[in-house]
Amino acid sequence: GVITERVQGDAVDAQVRDLVVKAIAQLGELGAIVSDIDIPLIAQSATISTAVTYGDVSGVHREGIDKRLKEYDYNLQLRLLAGAILPAQAHQKAVRLRHMLRQQILDALDQVDVLVTPTSSIPASPLPEKAGVESKEAFMEMLGGRRSFTAPFNLASVPALSINCGFTSEDLPVGLQIAGKPFDESTVFRVAYAYEQATDWHT
């Protein structure tokens, strides 16, 4: 099942889209029945994940935030502080939305064996010259998780993996994410292995 909004969405880099579409076509040539799947809440999955995880993590690290915040990595400091000021109502709503999203994903997996999306809306980034978030825009990207598409399957507690599906014109790798039913890792691995054997991205 192809999660259409994750492949054709405006946030997806054009080269990422092209490579993922080619990978999906390759799976079809290998015998997979390809169909489009709609998961309404998936567009909000990164925001849900941020509210759930940041709130939980800041609670666990409350003493560290109060007494030795500077000992944490700078990016982790930002996450902990964001979680510390998150209203309890927002966290509770995110937990409810997580359960709704999980049910939508499970309903989708009742129709297909696996779900496929890009792993990220952009290719793998070069290593930064220095750690830390250097702008408001970068911080909002981090909070919103606009680049990574792994959040929904983490929230749904279903197995997922990322496999290389090609390289951009700048030789940056692009990931194809394959997710399956709970406790059905074997199917996810079989799909990934079949794709890997039909391509040379892994060599």
Task: Report each predicted region and the residues it spans.
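Short, surface-exposed loop/helix-turn segments at secondary-structure junctions
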Residues: V52, Q92-K93, S125-R147
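Short, glycine/charged-enriched secondary-structure capping and boundary segments
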Residues: Q15-D18, E129-G132, Q177
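Acidic helix-start/capping segments at beta-turn-to-alpha-helix junctions
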Residues: P40-A51
